[in-house]
Amino acid sequence: MKWEKNMVYFGREQAWGAALGAGLGAGVGMASGASKVGTAALSGAGFAAGMKVGQLAEMPTPVAILTVMEAEKIDVGVLLKQGFIDALGKTSTLKVVGDDEPADAQIQLTVAEWGFRLTQGFSSVIYPTLNVVAQMNRGDEMIWRTSEAVTPFNGQNVYGYTPLTYRTDPEALRRALTGITQISGRYLVQELK
């Protein structure tokens, strides 16, 4: 299982930045960090896992989400691996063995991209996203490879919340990331058949 903790984030503050800067460089507002306007708009945010009140509100949204994930031990890699194993156990004849046990093939799951995105320009709700590459090797031979993306437009992705919710409700964040990793696990196992 491989995943980078670098998150892709495109929320309302980035949409506003892109819209305002369209004539002079549309990409200005699309940086991963929230703008000062976006940060100020979210200044009512609370705290998580011992953070001082307002401390999360001062952070750009992506940094605040990563801070909550770290404090609450929410690991996309662990969630994805479990979602894949659960889906495999329900629908496949393949047997999963422990990491240190001998196997006739190895499956590598790699999170190519993950984060949060809007469904439309100025919505107040962002949805978790996940793009996973799965590959099965037997020795040096690749015998299967696929990728699956869960986007805000996926009908099963019902885990949209406001940035404020993701900042202040660790269980909503956990529920959203667990949900999309389970969706991804099911899709990947369907491709494996």
Annotated model-derived regions:
Residues 5-21, 29-34, 38-40, 95, ...:
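Surface-exposed short loop/turn segments
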Residues 74, 81-83, 89-96, 143-193:
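C-terminal/domain-edge helix-coil "capping" segments
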Residues 58, 62, 66, 112-114, ...:
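A generic structural signal for ordered alpha-helices
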Residues 65-115:
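Short, solvent-exposed, polar/charged sequence segments at loop or secondary-structure edges
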Residues 1-80, 84-86, 189-193:
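A structural "domain/chain start" motif
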